[in-house]
From Swiss-Prot:
Gene name for this UniProt entry: mraZ
GO biological process: negative regulation of DNA-templated transcription initiation
Major subcellular location class: cytoplasm
A GO term, aspect molecular function: transcription cis-regulatory region binding
Protein's name according to its UniProt entry: Transcriptional regulator MraZ
InterPro entries, per the entry: MraZ, MraZ_C, MraZ_dom, MraZ_N, MraZ_sf, SpoVT-AbrB_dom, SpoVT-AbrB_sf
Record keywords, A-Z: Cytoplasm, DNA-binding, Repeat, Transcription, Transcription regulation
Species the sequence originates in: Cereibacter sphaeroides (strain ATCC 17023 / DSM 158 / JCM 6121 / CCUG 31486 / LMG 2827 / NBRC 12203 / NCIMB 8253 / ATH 2.4.1.) (Rhodobacter sphaeroides)
Family listed: Belongs to the MraZ family.
Entry annotated with the keyword Transcription: yes
Listed PANTHER family: TRANSCRIPTIONAL REGULATOR MRAZ (PTHR34701:SF1)
CC annotations in GO: cytoplasm; nucleoid
Protein location: Cytoplasm, Nucleoid
Complex formation: Forms oligomers.
């Protein structure tokens, strides 16, 4: 995939659970939607798995993942787990004319956004991770990011040292 999801964006979530997809992410979603010819584009929001965020994939990327799942032997625990968490616990999403989506109830539940927080207004963080992007509740994202960096990298270390294992 030539296009990649990059960057970190904080977006307001309104009382109706609407949130604007960052403009750079919209371009990648459009490029990865084979049916897009202007107007509304689509992507897949996955809320399965044991995590505090939802993952979002372009239609093309999700088709590649589905093909990999199909290649696993039917009925195996690995295939059933992936089918449940990547296919069953996923929704096709369509951006409205303003580039927004309505965060679905299952997605809001995964993020930990309560009805009271929606009424008062809350914020979501969109984090690009190459072939997908994540949507987090903003305060959860900030806490997780700080904790992860503390564990992975000593202060002052070169972050590219984490790539040494790749052999590239």
């Amino acid at each position: 995939m030539a296009e990649a999801f990059r960057g970190e964006y904080n977006q307001k979530v309104d009382a109706k659970a609407r949130v604007s997809i960052p403009a750079p992410f919209r371009r990648v979603i459009e490029a990865g939607d084979p049916k897009f010819s202007g107007g509304r584009s689509s992507f897949v929001l996955v809320y399965g798995g044991d995590r505090s965020y939802v993952e979002c994939y372009t239609i093309s990327e999700m088709e590649r993942i589905e093909e990999r799942i199909r290649s696993l032997p039917m009925g195996t625990p690995k295939r059933r787990y992936l089918e449940r968490n990547m296919i069953t616990l996923a929704l096709n999403m369509e951006l409205d004319e303003d580039g927004r989506i309505v965060l679905p109830p299952k997605g809001r539940e995964k993020l930990g956004i309560s009805p009271d927080e929606l009424k008062g207004g809350t914020e979501a963080t969109f984090a690009g991770t190459l072939n997908k992007f994540q949507i987090w509740k903003a305060d959860t994202y900030a806490a997780e990011l700080a904790a992860e960096e503390e564990v992975l990298l000593p202060p002052g270390a070169d972050m590219l040292s984490l790539l040494e294992e790749t052999g590239l």
